[in-house]
Regions:
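Conserved N-terminal helical subregion
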Residues: 65, 74-160, 166-172
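A structural signal for isolated positions on well-ordered beta-strands in alpha/beta enzyme cores
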Residues: 9, 32-34, 81, 210
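Beta1/beta-strand and adjacent pyrophosphate-binding region of the FAD-binding site
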Residues: 2-14, 34
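Conserved FAD-binding catalytic core of PHBH/FMO-like flavoproteins
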Residues: 147-237
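Glycine-rich FAD pyrophosphate-binding loop
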Residues: 11, 23-50
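N-terminal FAD cofactor-binding segment of flavoenzymes
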Residues: 46-85
Length: 237
């Protein structure tokens, strides 16, 4: 992309950048908005991409519904059980208590990504000044804008030398676990000395759940080396 001027430039074509572009265009269809996207133009390569579960609040669903960007498949959370390892007591939150359709939702990353791309293409038809630019590492050369939104998950090569992060000494294992006699639409969250452990609903039915297990990098690396039986034993301990 050569030198150009925009009201808003959004850097990053993932779910955050796509949603930001769609909402801005919905409210200001005549605005000069540019989306810089490192993903391919065609959706084909994205269909088999990241299938990890992403937890979204019910408020996020309401917002995404306004731009017709909610995936056709999701796993709803109706109850959340919260506890702390080694401590007595628990907290139980329900959708009935809060008078909500759901407390949250689990969607696959690829599903929300593809749905947002489709929604943005529809909005693009009535937005004459919108530029959706699929870029390479060496582009764009120069852009002027009133506002720049950084929605890029990674770093550009030109940013590698900049101290732009902080090491919190945390990592997480993300995957699926098979369970028995699970209550449908229930999520569990347990706080441990190393960080939170969450077990969440999935698209695959009540017996297959999403797992997010936070811990130190050393602990996470060790858990990755365990056999399935050893991993489950550690998870249940």
């Amino acid at each position: 992309m050569s030198s150009t001027y925009s009201d808003i430039v959004i850097q990053g074509g993932g779910p955050v950048g796509l949603a930001c572009a769609a909402w801005c265009l919905q409210k200001y269809p005549e605005a000069k908005i540019a989306l810089l996207d490192r993903n391919p133009v065609d959706d084909t390569d994205l269909v088999a991409a990241d299938s990890r579960g992403v937890a979204l609040s019910h408020g996020s669903k309401i917002l995404l519904d306004t731009i017709d960007a909610w995936p056709s498949e999701c796993a709803d959370i109706h109850r959340v059980h919260v506890s702390q390892a080694g401590r007595f007591g628990r907290a139980l939150m329900t959708r009935e208590e809060l008078n909500q359709d759901a407390l949250g939702h689990i969607v696959r990353y690829r599903d929300i990504h593809l749905t947002l791309r489709k929604a943005l293409r529809a909005i693009q038809k009535t937005s004459p000044h919108f530029i959706w630019q699929h870029i390479k590492d060496d582009a764009p050369a120069h852009i002027d804008a009133k506002c720049i939104v950084h929605a890029e998950g990674g770093l550009f090569k030109t940013q590698d030398w900049v101290e732009s992060g902080r090491d919190y000494g945390q990592s997480a294992l993300v995957g699926l676990v098979e369970v028995e006699n699970a209550t449908p639409h229930q999520a569990w969250e347990r706080f441990t000395a190393e960080g939170p452990l969450a077990v969440l609903p999935s698209h695959y039915g009540p017996q297959i759940l999403n797992l997010v297990w936070c811990g130190s990098p050393e602990s996470s690396s060790h858990r990755l080396q365990l056999s399935d039986a050893e991993f489950l034993s550690s998870l249940q301990s």
